[in-house]
Amino acid sequence: KIITKIFKTGGEIAYKNLKRSKKKYRTTVISIIVSVVIFIAISSFIQYGFKMSSAYYTEKNYNYVVYARTAEILTDISNLPDIGEYSINKSNIFEMNMDDKHKSELTEYGKNIKNRYYAEDKNGNLIDNINIISLNKSSYENYVKNIGGNYETYKDGAILVDNNINVDDNGKRIQGSMYTWKKGDTVTGKIDDKEYSIKIVSKTEERPNGVENLYNTEAYFIVSEEFINKTGFKSAALYAQSNDTDKLDEEVEQYKTENSFTNSDLNAFNMEESIRAENAVVLVISIFLYGFIGVITLIGITNIFNTITTNMNLRKKEFA
C-alpha cells in the first residue's frame, strides 16, 4: 500500500517483479552501483594524475634550468637571446656541531627531524647542515624587496628560510619550523672547514627560484652573491623563465657544441618538455581507463535493458 501511494501503479508492478525475481534485480542494481563507483573512482584517479604530473612544475616561477661546471658558463648562458628572466644560484653547506647549545636552538619539530635524519662529519661527530644559496645581484635585490628588506642592510647577512615539510614514520605529512632563531641572532659554523659567524637579517617563508623543494631535512640561508663569493661555493645553477624553451634548447646546444662542452660541463633541463611528456603518458593511460569505464558501463546498461525487456515481455498482461 505504501509503495502504491508513493510510486503509483508503476511502482506496484516493479515491486511485484522484484519479489518474483530478486536475483535478477539484485544483479541489475549491483551493475548500476559498480558502474557508477568505477566511473567515479577512475575519473578521480585520472584527474589526480594530471594534477600531480604538473604540480611539481606549475608552482615554480621558472621553466628552464641549467647546471654548469663554472659560474662563468652560466653567465654566458644568461646572455642567450631567449633566456628571459633568470636567476643564477650558487650554493654551499653551512656545517654546525650538534652540541647541547645547538640542540637547544631546535624546535620540537626540528628535534624530531634531526633525530630521524642525522648527519656526521668525517670524524663521526654529529653535525647539522644548512644550505647556503646565493642569488645574482638583480634577483637578490628583487627577493629582498619582496620580503620588505633593503639590499645594503641584508647583503652581509643571511635570510633564514625555515618552513619545512616532511613525512613522519607513518607516511603522514608534517610541517613546521626547525629552529628557534629569530632576526638579529648570530649563528656560528663552518663552510669548507673554515669558521664563520652569520647574522640572520630576516626570517621568512618566501622562497626564491630554485628553493621550492619542500621535502627536505634542512633549512636555507639565502645570501647575496657578494657574501658567497667571499666564502666560496660548491655548485651553481641558472633558473630561467623563457618565452620559448624549445628555441632556448637549440641555443644552449649550439653554445655547448661551439665550446666542445660535455654533459658534465653543462646540462640543461627543459621543464616545458617534461610537462608535455608526462601529460602524454597520462593521456594514454586516461584513454585506456576511460575505455575500460565505457565497456563496464555498456555491460551494465545492456544488463539493465535485457532485464527490463525480458520482464516486460513476460508480464504483458499486467501492463495491459
Regions inferred by a protein language model and the residue ranges of each:
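Hydrophobic alpha-helical scaffolding
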Residues: T4, F39, I174-S177, Q241, ...
